[in-house]
Amino acid sequence: MRKIERIFVHCTAGNQKQTLQQLKDEFIRKGWKNPGYHYVVFPDGKLVQLLSEDKVSNGVQGYNSTSINVSYVGGIDKQGRPLDNRTQAQKDTLYALLMYLKQQHPKAHILGHRDIWGKNSKNWKKYCPCFDAEEEYKDINNML
């Protein structure tokens, strides 16, 4: 079993109508053997597991071997700018998923992809997941 130190939250950086097949095609276009996320949450709240947690996904370069990566579909506006456009169903499913993952991996820290570059947005190479995941999920991070 892999030692999980981090649970990264992502957005797909696509529109909210992005399909599962379109997402899989994107990973193939990038030449990845495995998907970028272990789990993805669609606007209706549907949760899909793309990869077993015992396998390494391609979520955050340099951190993947000790991380679980979860994403919501969306994260940009119609002009392609970063936007937290999660639906309430996505928020609810993400919260429940992160609670479950934290219980399974109590030492893991939940954070957003962008947080590997610190809290100052001038240092971010990406805005993903387009909201402050550490702040939003601090109660889960602090529960165990």
Q: What is the predicted function of each stretch?
A:
Residues 33, 63-65:
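Short, flexible loop/turn motifs enriched in small residues
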Residues 1-55, 129-132:
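Short, conserved "active-site rim" segments that organize catalytic pockets and cofactor/ligand binding
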Residues 54-61, 99:
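Short amphipathic alpha-helices and their capping/turn segments at secondary-structure boundaries
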Residues 70:
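Ligand-binding face of N-terminal immunoglobulin V-set domains in extracellular IgSF glycoproteins
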Residues 1-8, 12, 66, 75-144:
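Basic/polar, cationic surfaces and motifs that engage anionic cell-wall
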